[in-house]
């Protein structure tokens, strides 16, 4: 299923590319496919490789196919010139046991389609072996993508990173998921964002806006969140996600069930305007490539998802500089791989004609600099990378950055390319360019983008930008001040680290009308509550303190009772809202969707099945005086334990309940305060924060001190 404006054909089948877990397209059109016949849960050595496919005439049929290299669990690929960056595991044949996961670079100097020997490890141990050994490489570190700023961005799943090490000796540990970045030589590794669950890839637009589509099990089911990644942002998983949402950057949307996989920001001039300049997000569970229409909202965005292309269990997507879009279809290869399943599909606009993209390394200097003015994001990135090999052209590149007639995307590409070419020597010219409001945001970012190249960067330009009229500039300034390392700016950051709500007292919920003890598989509880003064009835199930695994609970025979003793079954009424952390909510149904039965095996057609944590809200019928039910676990629960709570409002279900906001509603008003607080933490500005307690800057100070 594709839009009528596109044409598609099968590029390769399982004979060449079974189990395609990832892919990338070189700017010049070569397609690299990561074949992982272990899938997410399989184990053992020798089941992975990277296949290189070449379609030199643009007819959609590869004339050449070679095994570029053999690696275990290939999960991310980037082609730059004659180098291929590969995210992969290591499973020695001698043990058959996963030993490590690395980011490596392979070279093919003669461009014959086969790597010249073993790859060089750039970052070792980018995912802890223990979890990968026990479960498989499913919540592990996955996709990689190159930004126009020259960093490689790594999508880290909720296995996290423990003891990763770069080529310069930098070590990094990050508990849980997030985005980590590193220079292409393996140096300067650092955390970009954290607090994510199971992301697979990142989409990066020409202005360094970054988007992910991950999933999480901490609310509303196993749901996916579409997130705008803002540098230094904390997105909540797992510690703040539910009960301290006022301290996180919220997602742009909670999109229900699914499994986010590959991601790409598409900006290619050969594509129809309708489908161009958009983030494309793969959803493996829904077999959909999805467009998210993003609209600026302060320093962030709002979004509207739109189905774009249906592809069977789509795992990844990429585009070359001629406009050929490729999608990797897992196509039912299962959780442990299947050599007879999987393929790669090609998409182009109707009427598209193949125009070969020249290798940037072969271009003359003038043509190469001009390529920064291309309307293709792929072409600009390729040009930028080749320009790094020609430092003598730095001034010509800066001329593009200065050119107000150039597109904004071209100017931004030139700013980041110039900084990479000239290093710290670029800072004086860039500081002068900060006076141009059209590019100020990216100038500020480039000045502090690399901590090793900040000589000559003064705090003044960043402090002044905290009060800029553009909220994106404000956020860039706060992030930059945190990286600059000068604690004397703490007072300026404290002034920015307020949401304007610090004076509002948090109102704690009142005690519930009923709260049971912990109920396990051997017990149940009789519930009889006076609801004569209730307007709404909140039926809450929380976990019993041991997590929510198999917490299949039920409100058995729930009824309202009036003063005359007449009973009204809840089954005959309509609830106002019902949300559960996992599974189904329904009468006569367990959370699993099976027939609801008591622990003794008795069918309960009037019972209301649910799962911890859940909240079900009913309007209280006129004349009702009591609510009665029996709370217990369903027969499908194994070792669950829960508590039942009845209240007239949402109670504090666990420690941390209070004045909090939703986890997936855009909140641009929090962004400057959030990154300013993170900057204070990075500057270790505890003394300034303590001094600010009790002043108008208490909110940010206390937030940072926590």
What are these regions (language model features)?
Residues 1-368, 382, 386, 656:
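Beta-propeller domains with acidic blade repeats across secreted/periplasmic ectodomains
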Residues 22, 170, 191-193, 383-389, ...:
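Cofactor-pocket helix-loop regions in the catalytic cores of large enzyme subunits
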Residues 24, 32, 78, 83-87, ...:
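Hydrophobic, aliphatic-enriched repeat segments that assemble into extended interaction scaffolds
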Residues 181-222, 300-340, 460, 464-505, ...:
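Repeat-solenoid scaffold signature
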Residues 235-236, 350-358, 563-570, 651-654, ...:
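Short, charged low-complexity linker/loop segments at the C-terminal edge of domains
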Residues 355-359, 377-391, 409-423, 428-432, ...:
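Structural detector for internal amphipathic alpha-helices that build alpha-solenoid repeat scaffolds
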Residues 362-370, 391-403, 422-434, 453-467, ...:
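Amphipathic alpha-helical scaffolding segments comprising HEAT/armadillo-like alpha-solenoid repeats
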Residues 506-656:
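Gly-Asp-aromatic-enriched flexible segments
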